[in-house]
């Protein structure tokens, strides 16, 4: 845990349910260590329980179902190095349980639907990430999961997605513009793939963020199309395509990195890593090592895993620079 003299670094991880937040948080824990990182699920700040939302005719995505005043006050208190009595939302019962004491830590992650929604909370966040699954991929994933595992019909699944869509569009999706990085999961362009078994993943990196320099492929600021398949990277049809270049995203100047396709042999990932710069690694092959450490994590064999690890490494770099800055005495 931390003391009031330490710099608490606050990370925001935003996105809809089923977008990969849990896997990303596991990768962050691998980097920072469980003892140094506290994760707060912002569902705990629901002001209405499940029955209350049903009676009021609102979803959990609607700001009216959430207590942003309490969220702001408690996150501000944690960031100042003091403990809080955090409410608990019970996902099994749908009820609000008695609060629990939460101590500050070196890294505090707030994750959920709204970490970048409220301007007051957003101003407290040192680094913000938005995990963005395209509607086409989201539908395909949900169909595969819910039809196979839960026995839902195709019509039920589409109805569930469409019921959430207006609130998602109004309250969740706009947070992308405030994130320092966005990880987008999109349909492949390599072949026609109606089941989304192959993915095109983009890392959108905002320019001009304090202590954050976008990673790049080969030559910073250039536009690069690269097919790394060959003697040093094993690929089966339809292969892998990578892209890097400058762009504009929701009014922000950004650098894009993109991976379309699947990596066949993770041990060979070091070849790709070797051509990426400003990754935040501390030694040669660290990114590949982190991917190999948890081959079982979803997305490890495509751009999802690669960019989640890369963003985690960049967060570690931001953390180190923020804490170093806090230790420098102010000039008289």
UniProtKB/Swiss-Prot annotation:
InterPro entries: P-loop_NTPase, PRK, PRK/URK
Name of the molecule in the record: Phosphoribulokinase
Gene expressing this chain: prk
EC number: 2.7.1.19
Effect of residue 222 to Y: In a light-sensitive mutant with reduced activity
EC category: transferase
Catalytic activity: D-ribulose 5-phosphate + ATP = D-ribulose 1,5-bisphosphate + ADP + H(+)
Keyword set includes Metal-binding: no
Family (UniProt): Belongs to the phosphoribulokinase family.
Organism: Synechocystis sp. (strain ATCC 27184 / PCC 6803 / Kazusa)
GO MF annotation, one: ATP binding
Induction: By light.
Record key words, sorted: ATP-binding, Calvin cycle, Kinase, Nucleotide-binding, Photosynthesis, Transferase
């Amino acid at each position: 845990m931390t003391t009031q003299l330490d710099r608490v670094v606050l990370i925001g991880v935003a996105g809809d349910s089923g977008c990969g937040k849990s896997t990303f948080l596991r990768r962050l824990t691998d980097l920072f260590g469980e003892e140094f990182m506290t994760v707060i699920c912002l569902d705990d700040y629901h002001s209405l329980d499940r029955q209350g939302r049903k009676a009021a005719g609102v979803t959990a995505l609607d700001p009216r179902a959430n207590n942003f005043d309490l969220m702001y006050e408690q996150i501000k208190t944690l960031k100042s190095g003091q403990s809080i009595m955090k409410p608990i939302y019970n996902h099994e019962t749908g009820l609000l349980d008695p609060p629990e004491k939460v101590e500050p830590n070196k890294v505090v992650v707030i994750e959920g639907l709204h970490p970048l929604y409220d301007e007051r909370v957003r101003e407290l966040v040192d680094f913000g990430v938005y995990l963005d699954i395209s509607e086409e991929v989201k539908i395909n994933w949900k169909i595969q999961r819910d039809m196979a595992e839960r026995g839902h019909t195709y019509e039920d699944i589409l109805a569930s997605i469409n019921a959430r869509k207006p609130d998602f569009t109004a309250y969740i999706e706009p947070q992308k513009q405030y994130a320092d990085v966005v990880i987008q999961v999109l349909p492949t362009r390599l072949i026609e793939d109606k089941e989304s078994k192959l993915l095109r993943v983009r890392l959108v990196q905002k320019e001009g963020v304090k202590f954050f320099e976008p990673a790049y492929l080969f030559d910073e600021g250039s536009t690069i199309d690269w097919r790394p398949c060959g003697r040093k990277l094993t690929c089966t049809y339809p292969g892998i395509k990578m892209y890097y270049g400058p762009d504009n995203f929701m009014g922000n100047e950004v650098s894009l990195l993109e991976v379309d396709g699947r990596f066949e042999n993770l041990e060979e990932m070091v070849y790709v890593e070797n051509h990426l710069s400003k990754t935040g690694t501390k030694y040669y092959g660290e990114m590949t090592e982190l991917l190999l450490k948890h081959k079982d994590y979803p997305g490890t064999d495509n751009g999802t895993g690669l960019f989640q690890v890369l963003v985690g490494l960049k967060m570690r770099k931001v953390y180190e620079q923020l804490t170093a800055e806090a230790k420098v005495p102010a000039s008289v």
